[in-house]
């Protein structure tokens, strides 16, 4: 399970962490706060650093969610390489649209 929280203290996520731990689910947390409950509960922590959000109160997750997207895209690319995930496998779960059409042509 992957959790993302800039401060790592999002109360809505903490009960889910407990359930995951009880079920033996591995936890990855992306956060700025390495001392936070989410970071402390994680098997793997990815430190995210955002100097400032774009809104005038520095409160809305604008810059941090953009950075999070980049982290997730990098993780996806790394996992595809690490696991040897193939285009044929992706085509099975994404059969439609231009991407599905292209993937299914390659799979033939």
Regions found by a protein language model. Give the residues of each.
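Glycine-rich phosphate-binding loops that contact phosphosugars or nucleotide phosphates
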Residues: 1-83
């Amino acid at each position: 399970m992957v959790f993302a929280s800039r401060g790592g203290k999002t109360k809505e996520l903490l009960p889910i962490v407990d359930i995951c731990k009880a079920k033996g689910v591995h936890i990855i947390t992306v956060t700025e706060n390495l001392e936070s409950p989410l970071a402390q509960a994680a098997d793997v922590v990815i430190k995210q650093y955002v100097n400032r959000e774009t809104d005038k109160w520095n409160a809305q997750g604008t810059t941090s969610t953009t950075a999070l997207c980049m982290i997730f895209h990098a993780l996806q690319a790394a996992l595809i390489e690490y696991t040897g995930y193939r285009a044929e496998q992706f085509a099975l779960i994404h059969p439609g649209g231009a991407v599905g059409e292209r993937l299914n042509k390659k799979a033939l």
